[in-house]
Design a protein with these regions (language model features):
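Conserved catalytic-core motifs of GNAT/GCN5-like acyltransferases
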Residues: 52, 65-90
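C-terminal "cap" of GNAT-fold acetyltransferases
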Residues: 63, 82-134
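Conserved beta-strand in the GNAT
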Residues: 1-8, 14-21
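Conserved GNAT acetyl-CoA-binding A-motif
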Residues: 41-61, 65
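Conserved acetyl-CoA-binding loop-helix of GNAT-fold acetyltransferases
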Residues: 22, 28-42
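A short, internal acetyl-CoA/4′-phosphopantetheine-binding micro-motif in the GNAT/acyltransferase core
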Residues: 20-27, 55-57
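Conserved N-terminal glycine/acidic-rich loop preference
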Residues: 13-18, 58-75, 113
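A generic structural signal for beta-strand entry/edge sites
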Residues: 12-14, 48, 93
Length: 135
């Protein structure tokens, strides 16, 4: 139905979307949303994903559709003065950020609590049962 290419930035705990393509016959069927849901699930420890987005162009409806899609996912515009580097001096784009942590906060919190409890309170009996009660 499509594919995605992204860069894993472990140093900054984020992803960078390089390219996403959903074949035309699969547009508006939820495949793009499923790709991002899979990324969030796989990389839930990461803060989120950076999206380099073309400026809106009424003559190019796909640019408008992409922007609407990213906003629907929860992406926020971070910079309208972003320059995508290329050998022609750069391309003016907008930079969006789609946070993963808000949606996956409960999972992340549980993982952090588990690590802290197992380290700090390792002397407590049945620590696993206590951890499991925390939602």
């Amino acid at each position: 139905a499509g594919y995605v290419i992204f860069f894993i930035d472990k140093k900054n705990n984020t992803l960078w979307l390089d390219y996403i393509a959903i074949f035309k016959e699969h547009h508006s069927k939820g495949f793009g949303t499923r790709i991002f849901e899979a990324m969030k699930k796989e990389f839930f420890e990461f803060s989120g994903v950076w999206l380099e987005v073309e400026k809106p162009d009424e003559n190019e409806p796909d640019t408008l559709r992409r922007r609407k899609f990213y906003k629907k996912l929860g992406a926020r515009i971070v910079s309208e003065n972003y320059i995508y580097p290329n050998n022609n001096g750069g391309l003016s784009m907008d930079l969006y950020f789609l946070p993963f942590c808000e949606e996956n906060f409960a999972k992340k919190m549980h993982k952090c609590v588990k690590t802290a409890f197992e380290t700090i309170h390792s002397d407590v009996e049945n620590i696993e049962k206590i951890i499991d009660k925390i939602k």
